[in-house]
Amino acid sequence: MKKSEIASKYIKTIPNSMSLVRHYIKLASEPEVSFARFRVMCNVSRGLNTVSEIAELHGVSCAGISKLVESLVSDGYLERSVSPTDRRITELDLTGAGAKLLSKIRKQASNEFESYLNQLTESELNKLGRALDCLESLFESVQERKN
């Protein structure tokens, strides 16, 4: 398959995938955890720990992310601290409750999705696993280049 065909298939497939992920997260989440709040918690868990970093990734204003962060702090899922290297920067971290909730949602959403994988053969499952590994590496590489 040509690179242009892969790129086109990616652009067509990923939005559909995100809709499914959003659906699984909604099924697995506590009522107060919207998909946007889930994404912020995921971002913080993987090391994006300032409002500006998260806002840039989501393509929204800092004010919009700040509201989500404030609600997550108020609910006890995130905590703020002053950066040890630059006192002007406020860093975000998951609390124990936030990490526990995020883990629970991910597990339940994965379980929801797993039932659909039954229609794939063992060979297709292996190919899908390798493709997802490649995508994960590609996303990490792109993110590193952006920083």
Language-model regions: role of each:
Residues 71-127:
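Charged, amphipathic alpha-helical coiled-coil/dimerization segments
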